Curated annotation (Swiss-Prot):
<comment type="function">
    <text>Catalyzes the isomerization between 2-isopropylmalate and 3-isopropylmalate, via the formation of 2-isopropylmaleate. Functions redundantly with LEUD2 in the methionine chain elongation pathway of aliphatic glucosinolate formation.</text>
</comment>
<feature type="transit peptide" description="Chloroplast">
    <location>
        <begin position="1"/>
        <end position="59"/>
    </location>
</feature>
<dbReference type="GO" id="GO:0009570">
    <property type="term" value="C:chloroplast stroma"/>
</dbReference>
<keyword id="KW-0150">Chloroplast</keyword>
<keyword id="KW-0809">Transit peptide</keyword>
<dbReference type="Pfam" id="PF00694">
    <property type="entry name" value="Aconitase_C"/>
</dbReference>
<keyword id="KW-0456">Lyase</keyword>
<dbReference type="InterPro" id="IPR050075">
    <property type="entry name" value="LeuD"/>
</dbReference>
<comment type="subunit">
    <text>Heterodimer of the large LEUC/IIL1 subunit and the small LEUD (SSU1, SSU2 or SSU3) subunits.</text>
</comment>
<dbReference type="GO" id="GO:0120528">
    <property type="term" value="F:2-(omega-methylthio)alkylmalate dehydratase activity"/>
</dbReference>
<comment type="pathway">
    <text>Amino-acid biosynthesis; L-leucine biosynthesis; L-leucine from 3-methyl-2-oxobutanoate: step 2/4.</text>
</comment>
<keyword id="KW-0100">Branched-chain amino acid biosynthesis</keyword>
<keyword id="KW-0432">Leucine biosynthesis</keyword>
<keyword id="KW-0028">Amino-acid biosynthesis</keyword>
<dbReference type="InterPro" id="IPR015928">
    <property type="entry name" value="Aconitase/3IPM_dehydase_swvl"/>
</dbReference>
<keyword id="KW-0934">Plastid</keyword>
<dbReference type="InterPro" id="IPR033940">
    <property type="entry name" value="IPMI_Swivel"/>
</dbReference>
Length: 256
């Protein structure tokens, strides 16, 4: 099932505390959004790329000239890191490492160093080596209920800062999925089968997205796996997050 994001009002006063009634209903297999539900985490601020302030461009984001049509040609290639079911946000980033939200590259590097550092000891292969802040694994493969637990938006942010571009899982916790879209850090993609049982950490994989879905190719095993369409969430992530998308579409004023 394709995901549909709500439409935005043309402008909202900064002092307004009312939720716009013009928001359309969002439906997915995991969550339902309506006019009283916000997709925008209150602590996230994405600066305009035209300002002199430090600009954070999420790793899943494409260039500003890309459009909805360009999403159909989005491809990710790299090594995969395989997990199983119920990977919670404490495993993705421990609470002690999520005290502040990164506002510059140095802080992104600091938070990236903690990506998936809360995994149990039986995970012998580390997502990031000690002392590093970039992972060699650009694609994460999981099972059911990926990103469950607390609502911290630091979870997708630290994965994107560490170099992850996409996650392929059977299902997602609704807040993690929403935060992934809102921040534009990683593509939360759904598999049609249990890919986490078919792939191993270190396999070389390619993800190709299209309007109707996507395809994950495991070059190590030679097998292909269909992915479900991410729908209207795709262009938002591709733009760099919900604020960047809204500015690009003229839904809210530019900071320039």
């Amino acid at each position: 099932m394709a995901y549909s994001l709500p439409t935005f009002p043309q402008a909202l006063p900064c002092s307004s505390t009312k939720t716009s009634s013009s928001l359309a209903t969002f439906r997915s297999p995991f969550l339902r959004f309506n006019g009283s539900t916000s997709l925008i985490p209150s602590s996230i601020s994405i600066t305009s790329r035209g300002t002199s302030s430090p600009t954070i461009i999420p790793r899943a984001a494409a260039s500003e000239s890309d459009s909805n049509e360009a999403l159909a040609n989005t491809t990710f290639h790299g090594l995969c890191y395989v997990l199983k079911d119920n990977i919670d946000t404490d495993q993705i980033i421990p609470a002690g490492a999520a005290c502040t939200f990164p506002s510059n590259q140095q802080e992104r590097d600091e938070i990236a160093a903690h990506a998936l550092s809360g995994l149990p000891d039986f995970h012998k292969t580390r997502f990031i080596e000690p002392g590093e802040n970039r992972s060699k694994y650009s694609i994460i493969i999981g099972g059911e209920n990926f990103g469950c637990g607390s609502s911290r938006e630091h979870a997708p942010v630290c994965l994107g800062a560490a170099g992850a571009k996409a996650i392929v899982a059977e299902s997602y916790a609704r807040i993690f999925f929403r935060n992934s879209v809102a921040t534009g850090e990683v593509f939360p993609l759904e598999s049609e089968v249990r890919v986490c049982e078919e792939c191993k950490t270190g396999d070389t994989v390619t993800i190709e997205l299209s309007d109707s879905g996507g395809l994950l190719t495991n070059h190590t095993t030679g097998k292909n796996y269909k992915l479900k369409s991410i729908g209207d969430a795709g262009p938002v992530i591709d733009a760099g997050g919900i604020f960047a998308y809204a500015r690009m579409m003229g839904m809210i004023p530019s900071l320039a």
